[in-house]
């Protein structure tokens, strides 16, 4: 053990310090330091901690947990990172791309340079748009619309027709585009670039209008904030591009672009030169280092006097002091003293090259100044004065040119070019930019002078001598009879044509099989005829000579061995029609033999098979075989940048995105390097890895089920718009956050914990600084946010994928168009253009100048049409156009209630309303008739009158206490009514969502009545005839009904014509209510009536898009309907319960569609359910999926009804089946004929003939004389849902859709079979009346019977007859009797007979 003395106290520290050994305080300070370091972004490492060794290292547990909270989420391998995220609702509209214009009814106005249709302006000059690229897999071209140019084959016709009209159909035109370049368009390999930056160019091309794919916005950098509010909007708003440079593809240089509007406002707003320049061009461009502002201040502006120019104003000026052109550094010298420049070739003597860098050059003026003599000083002042005079002369010249241009009112350049060069090489021609007759937008370039650009091979020139055309040994000139050899001439004196034909046929039949040569080969025919000529037309001798001499080698016919043929086919399969590499691949045959063999071989069956054309030819052959059964309209897939996946059965499983590797997408788009059409066709023919003769050769290490390369909709959107490829979200996030791990984790945490789906947490400015497209950043943030949901609930990914695929149908329909066959054939287009021009000339001659006349209005009506939509907005009912009413004055007569319009101010127009000579109020309207303001007196009067009118209306399932929705007293759209004009009553409609009730109320107030021909076209409806020529002059030519397509019978008075659109129908086919006795007394064609779409236009209560929701047929050719060339007419539409429209015949034939009101045949119910039910079926005529398809009665094929009507040999009829009395089916009973039967419409396609099979078939327009037509019977008794109100029916419809059920038959025939008794009209054969107290023998009226004394009234039979005439079913009678006491109907007949007060004889 050690001794006690060995233990010593510890040595005292030399420099004592106050040390705190309290661990709790040290830990607290350490935590604070860590928190401060984390906030400042500094990295804290435990290894560098300055805590004492005896102190435990501590950290903030909460902070540590937050940093690694989503560690498992980031490293989870079961959840993918490349799925297509669901876009928030606010971003879906901007995600649409690949938009295709509908040019069916589009027109082009050459004066306004605009493309428009009936609804809006589609394109105008100077619009910046996307255009499909070539090849289609590349990003969209970005360009500006310069103008519209007629196609070359129609340019002469259109140029002559411009004198009469400036509007033409769009299909005869193309669009001239001025392109903007992306960085990748200029340089091949660009790794990092700003996706929103483009470069202007002078490159222009003429392109088809159909290449349009959407609109974008391109601004100069200086003009961005004139349109957008801030810099952030420029980054986050889609389809925004900007530029500040121009790239010229000829000089291969970049130029700086200035906005003429900006330089006018910033540099000198009083300069006439800049004013005219701004009027002529939108932008000017110069070389990057060209001091344009200084040049203009010195040589153009007058703000600074010439004498006030300082030496600093000469330092930047590089004009040559001799020639006054701009000097380039490598071609000039600069004075070391004053900075004046001079060209090397302008010096005396000229210099070949610049001196070395250590050589200093001084100009002659500075040398004279250095001499200090009086003469040198005088010369210096003279040269300085000459320089100042030159500047004054330049300013004066430019000012004169500018003033002249202003006086001549020089405007924008006619070529619509945005850019004008005003750079280095235009320094001496600045004023020429204002010359209206000169146009030189391209950059100038000087002549290249010098040793580098000159040819030195002309030092030892030999005097040139012309080579004689005639050779020394030849006496005749080439081309004469002595220098040419005769191949064949027919001498009729030596041989006849018959003998010649026999000789040629003998050579073909005997020699060609031996040589294996076709008899039509040119070389064979030439040699045979040449031998005949050589033997002096002796056919026998010539045949022997041919048989003896001819061979394949002699005829230069290609002879390939089996090995050479195999190598040839392999080369063609590999290189296609590029025959030079084919020749090199074969190796043993010259190019001439390869070419001859290829053009004989490619049309053979083997050639077609190897080239992949055999299947295409067979397909075309099948198309020609069934051409007689096809309609005149064919459907095409018009988007070349995407795949027609409807024709690909493996579309969902065979494609894979080449950028993000996802395997699902609602649409697949082409990409360069991906699959093409031939590869996809081979895949569809042979399967995935099946080996056949024409299948693609898979590599030795090919994977099973290899995918076809394409782009998904997400990658295609970013690639087409911004030319960027998709990047994984974590990689995108690391680019934004940098190398800081804490920032990376914080960004992920912020993205996941953000609850607002429309808010993004990442900074747009950081993304812009890192050259990342904001749409890519949005996609990355959405993937991270939605991946967390998939991570927590893996089943949600299946729902997300299914939801994404639901957009396929909508996107596919946007890329499908229906065209008439041969519509774009040159001859057809030329004929259409000529017809259009002729019709336009006739219209101009036929339309007289109409002068408005004041209408006489004697009724106390309000001349204001109000649609009360919201408390603060009141609009007029004229929906077809915006009306202008500038400086309109209508003076009122003494006692007439015509409004007096005066201009109260520049903004409002005051309408004074007078009644009985005294003022009853006023109305203030703005010039655009968008807002109406009533004074209190007028408002109260309107309110009281509306209450009175509303109380008179029937109550349609709505309480009378509800507010009034729409008010229509009289049309404001036509205040200047012509005398004897066609006036229409505008019914006040109570608050009701039943569209059929609204249309019915209108027709009740506007029953058919007599109308003049000039009043048959309304002026302010959207559903206008497309030809301005009034088509009613040929009313007699309209021979068929638009519903049933049956011809009208002249003996029947059934035809009714719409006064606006010309719709011709049987009144019972369209469910038109006619007043009593109108049909007998008047001709229905001469009376006014409006169809439902035209009625809706007068007062829109439902959709104004009049297109059937059940079929693809579109009303596209009114002119040919009027010319009776085709069976095309305006659509006979009825409204649906959803506020859309449907063809009446489409709803009639579809058994699942019911009517809310069978008598009016509307509204159509269950249309959505029908569309869902038929979405997987295809029409046999138009080949379009879905719609209101109806199955053929004889087979399983389905068709759209309108497609069947427009096709030949299709039969649409009613099938009548006679039934027994004890039937369990709902049937119709005709009392007069004592007939019981069922009705149903049937479709028989063109593959079958009509066979009765015990049933009777009737046309759709069949109408018995005594009762309702068959179409009315079927709609009333089989299509009507009369047991419920419309609100209940819509509720049941939505309920069935929610549960995926289809509408069933409403008739419970097994329990309560219904028998519907037809009403019929009796007409007395003696007097013709149809009204009588009692009918004798069912045909003789009571009056005629009394005159004749034929019969006496039998009360027993009469009562029985009356009961039969009632025609009410038993169950309905019982319902009517509910709540009524039977005792009230007990009448004592004897007492009644003795009562004097009630007996007729006592009166």
Curated annotation (Swiss-Prot):
Zinc fingers, RING-type class: 1041-1095
Zinc finger (C2HC pre-PHD-type): 1105-1153
Residue ranges occupied by any BAH domain in the UniProt entry: 121-258
Zinc finger (PHD-type): 317-369, 1038-1097, 1177-1231
A biological process term (GO) from this entry: histone catabolic process
Subcellular location: Cytoplasm; Nucleus
Pfam families on file: BAH, PHD, zf-HC5HC2H_2
Skewed-composition ranges (Polar residues): 45-62
Reaction catalysis annotation: S-ubiquitinyl-[E2 ubiquitin-conjugating enzyme]-L-cysteine + [acceptor protein]-L-lysine = [E2 ubiquitin-conjugating enzyme]-L-cysteine + N(6)-ubiquitinyl-[acceptor protein]-L-lysine
Sequence ranges assigned to domain SANT in this UniProt record: 555-606
GO MF annotation list: chromatin binding; ubiquitin protein ligase activity; ubiquitin-protein transferase activity; zinc ion binding
Assembly description: Component of the Snt2C complex composed of SNT2, ECM5 and RPD3. Interacts with the E2 ubiquitin-conjugating enzyme UBC4 and histones H3 and H4. Binding is enhanced to methylated histone H3K36me3.
Full protein name: E3 ubiquitin-protein ligase SNT2
Protein source organism: Saccharomyces cerevisiae (strain ATCC 204508 / S288c)
């Amino acid at each position: 053990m050690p001794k006690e003395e060995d233990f010593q106290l510890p040595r005292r520290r030399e420099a004592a310090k106050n040390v705190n050994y309290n661990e709790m305080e040290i830990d607290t300070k350490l935590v604070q330091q860590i928190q401060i370091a984390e906030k400042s972004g500094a990295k804290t490492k435990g290894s560098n901690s300055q805590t004492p060794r005896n102190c435990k290292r501590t950290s903030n547990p909460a902070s540590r947990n937050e940093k690694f909270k989503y560690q498992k989420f980031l490293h989870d391998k079961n959840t993918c990172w490349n799925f297509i995220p669901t876009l928030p609702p606010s971003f879906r509209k901007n995600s649409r791309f690949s938009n295709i214009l509908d040019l069916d009814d589009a027109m082009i106005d050459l004066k306004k340079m605009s493309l428009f249709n009936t609804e809006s302006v589609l394109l105008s000059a100077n619009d910046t748009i996307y255009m499909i690229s070539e090849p289609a897999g590349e990003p969209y071209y970005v360009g500006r619309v310069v103008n519209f140019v007629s196609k070359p084959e129609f340019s002469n016709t259109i140029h002559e027709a411009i004198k009469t009209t400036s509007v033409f159909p769009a299909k005869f035109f193309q669009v001239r585009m001025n392109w903007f370049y992306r960085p990748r368009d200029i340089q091949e390999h660009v790794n990092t670039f700003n996706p929103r930056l483009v470069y202007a160019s002078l490159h222009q091309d003429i392109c088809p209008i159909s290449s349009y794919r959407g609109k974008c916005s391109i601004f100069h950098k200086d003009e961005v904030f004139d349109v957008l509010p801030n810099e952030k909007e420029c980054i986050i708003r889609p389809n925004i591009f900007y530029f500040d440079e121009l790239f010229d593809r000829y000089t291969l240089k970049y130029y700086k672009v200035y906005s003429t509007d900006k330089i006018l406002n910033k540099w000198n707003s009083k300069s006439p030169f800049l004013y005219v320049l701004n009027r002529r061009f939108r932008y000017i461009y110069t070389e990057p280092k060209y001091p344009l502002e200084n040049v203009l201040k010195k040589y153009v502006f007058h703000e600074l006097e010439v004498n006030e120019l300082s030496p600093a104003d000469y330092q930047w000026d590089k004009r040559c002091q001799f020639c006054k052109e701009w000097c380039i550094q490598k071609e000039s010298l600069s004075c070391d003293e004053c900075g004046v420049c001079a060209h090397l070739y302008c010096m005396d003597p000229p210099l070949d090259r610049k001196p070395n860098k250590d050589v200093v050059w001084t100009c002659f003026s500075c040398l004279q100044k250095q001499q200090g003599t009086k003469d040198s000083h005088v010369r210096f002042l003279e040269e300085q004065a000459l320089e100042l005079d030159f500047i004054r002369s330049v300013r004066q010249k430019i000012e004169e040119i500018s003033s002249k241009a202003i006086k001549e009112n020089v405007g924008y350049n006619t070529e619509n070019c945005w850019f004008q060069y005003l750079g280095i090489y235009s320094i001496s021609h600045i004023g020429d930019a204002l010359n209206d007759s000169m146009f030189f937008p391209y950059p100038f370039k000087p002549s290249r002078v010098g040793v580098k650009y000159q040819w030195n091979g002309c030092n030892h020139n030999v005097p040139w001598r012309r080579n004689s055309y005639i050779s020394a040994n030849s006496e005749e000139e080439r081309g004469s009879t002595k220098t040419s050899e005769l191949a064949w001439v027919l001498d009729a004196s030596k041989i006849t044509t018959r003998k010649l034909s026999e000789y040629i046929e003998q050579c073909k039949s005997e020699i060609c099989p031996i040589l294996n040569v076709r008899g039509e080969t040119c070389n064979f025919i030439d040699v045979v005829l040449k031998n005949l000529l050589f033997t002096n037309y002796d056919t026998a001798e010539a045949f022997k000579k041919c048989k003896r001499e001819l061979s394949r080698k002699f005829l230069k016919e290609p002879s390939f061995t089996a090995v050479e043929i195999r190598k040839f086919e392999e080369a063609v399969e590999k290189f296609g029609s590029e025959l030079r590499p084919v020749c090199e691949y074969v190796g043993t045959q010259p190019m001439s033999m390869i070419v001859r063999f290829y053009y004989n071989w490619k049309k053979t069956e083997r050639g077609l098979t190897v080239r992949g054309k055999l299947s295409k030819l067979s397909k075309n052959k099948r198309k020609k075989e069934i051409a007689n059964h096809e309609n005149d309209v064919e459907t095409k897939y018009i988007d070349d940048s995407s795949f027609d996946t409807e024709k690909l059965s493996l579309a969902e499983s065979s494609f894979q995105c080449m950028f993000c590797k996802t395997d699902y997408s609602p649409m697949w788009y082409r990409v360069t390097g991906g699959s093409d059409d031939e590869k996809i066709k081979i895949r569809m023919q042979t399967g995935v890895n099946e080996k056949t003769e024409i299948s693609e050769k898979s590599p030795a290490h090919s994977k099973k089920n290899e995918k076809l390369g394409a782009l998904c909709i997400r990658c295609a959107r970013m690639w087409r718009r911004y030319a960027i490829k998709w990047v994984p979200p974590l990689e995108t996030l690391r680019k934004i956050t940098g190398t800081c791990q804490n920032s990376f984790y914080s960004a992920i945490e912020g993205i996941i914990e953000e609850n607002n789906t429309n808010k993004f947490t990442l900074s747009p400015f950081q993304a812009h600084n890192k050259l990342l497209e904001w749409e890519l950043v949005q996609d990355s943030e959405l993937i991270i946010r939605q991946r967390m949901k998939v991570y927590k609930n893996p089943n949600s990914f299946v729902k997300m994928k299914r939801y994404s695929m639901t957009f396929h149908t909508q996107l596919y329909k946007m890329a499908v168009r229906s065209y008439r066959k041969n519509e774009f054939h040159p001859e057809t287009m030329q004929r259409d253009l000529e017809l259009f021009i002729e019709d336009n000339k006739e219209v101009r001659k036929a339309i007289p100048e109409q002068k408005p006349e004041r209408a006489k209005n004697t009724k106390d009506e309000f001349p204001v049409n109000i649609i009360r939509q919201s408390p603060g907005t009141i609009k007029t009912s004229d929906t077809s156009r915006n009306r202008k009413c500038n400086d309109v004055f209508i003076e009122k007569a003494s006692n007439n209630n015509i409004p007096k319009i005066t201009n109260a101010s520049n903004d409002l127009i005051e309408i004074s309303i007078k009644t009985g000579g005294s003022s009853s109020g006023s109305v203030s309207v703005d010039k655009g008739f968008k807002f109406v303001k009533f004074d209190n007196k007028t408002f109260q009067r309107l309110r009281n009158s509306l209450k009175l009118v509303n109380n008179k209306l029937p109550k349609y399932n709505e309480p009378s206490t509800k507010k009034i929705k729409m008010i229509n007293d009289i049309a404001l759209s036509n205040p200047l009514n012509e005398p004897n004009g066609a006036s229409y009553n505008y019914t006040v409609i109570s608050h009701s969502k039943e569209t059929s009730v609204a249309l019915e109320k209108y027709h009740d107030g506007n029953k058919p009545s007599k109308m003049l021909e000039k009043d048959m076209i309304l002026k302010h409806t959207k559903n206008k005839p497309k030809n301005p020529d009034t088509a009613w002059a040929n009313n007699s030519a309209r021979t068929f009904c638009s519903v049933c397509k049956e011809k009208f019978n002249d003996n029947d008075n059934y035809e009714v014509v719409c006064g606006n659109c010309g719709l011709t129908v049987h009144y019972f086919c369209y469910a038109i209510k006619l007043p009593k006795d109108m049909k007998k007394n008047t001709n229905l064609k001469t009376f006014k009536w409006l169809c439902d779409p035209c009625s809706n236009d007068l007062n829109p209560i439902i959709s104004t898009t009049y297109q059937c929701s059940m079929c693809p047929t579109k009303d596209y050719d009114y002119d040919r309907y009027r010319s009776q060339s085709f069976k095309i007419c305006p659509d006979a539409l009825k409204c649906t319960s959803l506020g859309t429209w449907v063809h009446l015949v489409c709803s009639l034939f579809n058994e699942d569609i019911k009517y809310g009101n069978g008598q009016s045949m509307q509204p159509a119910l269950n249309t959505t359910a029908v569309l869902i039910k038929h979405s997987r079926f295809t029409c046999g005529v138009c080949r379009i999926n879905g719609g209101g398809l109806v199955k053929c009665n004889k087979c399983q094929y389905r068709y759209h009804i309108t497609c069947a009507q427009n096709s030949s040999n299709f039969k649409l009829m009613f099938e009548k089946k006679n039934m027994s009395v004890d039937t369990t089916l709902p049937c119709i009973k005709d009392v007069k004929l004592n007939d019981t039967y069922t009705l149903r419409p049937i479709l028989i396609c063109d593959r079958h003939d009509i066979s009765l099979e015990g049933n009777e078939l009737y046309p759709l327009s069949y109408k018995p004389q005594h009762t309702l037509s068959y179409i009315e019977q079927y709609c009333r008794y089989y299509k009507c849902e009369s047991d419920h109100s419309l609100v209940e029916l819509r509720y049941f419809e939505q309920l069935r859709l929610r549960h995926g059920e289809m509408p069933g038959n409403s008739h419970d025939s097994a329990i309560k079979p219904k028998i519907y008794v037809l009403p019929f009209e009796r007409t007395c054969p003696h007097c013709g009346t149809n009204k009588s107290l009692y009918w004798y023998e069912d045909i003789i009226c009571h009056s005629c019977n009394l005159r004749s004394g034929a019969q006496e009234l039998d009360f027993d039979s009469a009562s029985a007859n009356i009961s039969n005439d009632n025609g009410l079913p038993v169950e309905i009678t019982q319902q009517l009797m509910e709540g009524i006491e039977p005792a009230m109907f007990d009448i004592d007949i004897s007492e009644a007979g003795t009562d004097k007060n009630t007996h007729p004889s006592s009166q």
